Amino acid sequence: MTGKTAPAAAKKAPAAKKAPAPASKKAPEPAPKEKPAPTPKEGHAPTPKEEHAPPPKEEHAPPPKEEHAPAPAAETPPAPEHPPDAEQPAAPAAEHAPTPTHEAAPAHEEGPPPAAPAEAPAPEPEPEKPKEEPPSVPLSLAVEEVTENSVTLTWKAPEHTGKSSLDGYVVEICKDGSTDWTAVNKEPFLSTRYKIHDLASGEKVHVRVKAISASGTSDPATLEQPVLIREITDLPRIRLPRQLRQVYVRHVGEAVNLLIPFQGKPQPQVTWTKDNQPLDTSRVNIRNTDKDTIFFIRTAQRSDSGKYQLSVRINGAEDKAILDIRVIERPGPPQNLKLVDVWGFNVALEWSPPADNGNSEIKGYTVQKSDKKSGKWFTVLERCTRTSCTISDLIIGNTYSFRVFSENACGMSETAAVAAGVAHIKKTVYQPQKIPERDMMEPPKFTQPLTDRATTRGYSTHLFCSVRGFPQPKIIWMKNKMEIREDPKYIAMIEQGVCSLEIRKPSPFDAGVYTCKAVNPLGEASVDCKLDVKMPK
């Protein structure tokens, strides 16, 4: 600190020089006394300074104006050349305030006090950061292979690694009967497979694995059973038959006899559980050999349904299989069967699914009817997948009852739901609605009149008009007010109310006024036209 404050003292020295001349002149006298002061300053600076402060105070008491010099003087003590100048201004300050004489020492030591405030913020404790959670336990620790002097382990990464990434794993072993765990690997590794070497043949060891990260170490994943160090020539493997890879269904009362082969050398240990619980030996019989296991239930009950787990283990090596066995029976009858509506020769029915489905999905419903006269039941619908239906083609005048069976994979329900009411199909006489007769009588009326025509001699021509009326009117053709009777030169026709007159090879004599007259009992009507026959050029 002495080296750092020296420049500051040098810079502030001029401020001290600006003080009155007598102060600067008398400075050399205490200088020899102050030269040894820097050495004690490093250890116990305050004591020597307080001892030398009073003599200069008495000498320079008259000039009180130098009270403003203490600040620069405080910064100058580290410099050995100018300490006298700094101490002289500090003396008057001490004279005017004898009580703060102890404060004078800090004034001389304003160089060291800055160290004290600098130390004050340092001790303030920073708020502790919340500790990060360590990784979770590694998953699915298992033995992959065992030889005469080694064990190969496999596992899966933990579900949670925390905010820090995973640094690796540590594998530890402990001899059976001991509690001392020893790390096998010196440094963490990231692989989820590890082979432990140099193990004694015939020895049993416990194995566990820990996950490590910057936030801490996880709880260990430990094998349930110790591993016997001996060579496994053939790893355990279950050869599950194809029909057992899906739900195995049996009916209530039937026997369940399953043979499941497996392999493994030396002979593996076989374990059966049901829904992760030990088997009920009063219901299930198990017989094991070195190559297969037999699962036998003499009389199956619905309570025997569930998921059975087969485990084949050699030391830590293990293979598992799950058998899903379902024992079913006939379902119960449908519920709440009722007649919803009866109209014409139709009936609408509704019901609810059975309370007991027999441990199997309901495939459909069978609906039957019975007429009051015969009393026999006849099936009208099979495998109806809905809980409602409409029955048609019932005989008018009969009274019908209805019942419904439910059906699953085991068969139809033993009993049926019978509708409380009956449906009576009433006789109804159909009377067509009478249509009022319409008066179609109408006098003749031409809807299309004749038009004047011009033709050339020797070229046949036609005259057309249309008429309506009821009864159908009689048509009379006339030429120049004279009725045309049966003349081969003229051909008259009427079809769908269209009247036509053909004049064959007309001559100038055939020119004139032609009239079409329609007559019926209600009246008559007529139209005229003019025909002009020209001579060819």
Swiss-Prot record:
BP terms from Gene Ontology: cell adhesion; sarcomere organization
Biased composition, class Basic and acidic residues, residue ranges: 26-69
Entry keyword annotation includes Repeat: yes
Stretches with biased composition (Pro residues): 112-124
Pfam families: fn3, I-set
Fibronectin type-III domain sequence ranges: 137-232, 333-428
Record-linked InterPro entries: FN3_dom, FN3_sf, Ig-like_dom, Ig-like_dom_sf, Ig-like_fold, Ig_I-set, Ig_sub, Ig_sub2
Keywords (A to Z) from UniProt: Cell adhesion, Immunoglobulin domain, Muscle protein, Repeat, Thick filament
Keyword Repeat: yes
Stated family: Belongs to the immunoglobulin superfamily. MyBP family.
Protein name in the entry: Myosin-binding protein H
Lineage of the organism: Eukaryota, Metazoa, Chordata, Craniata, Vertebrata
Gene that produces this protein: MYBPH
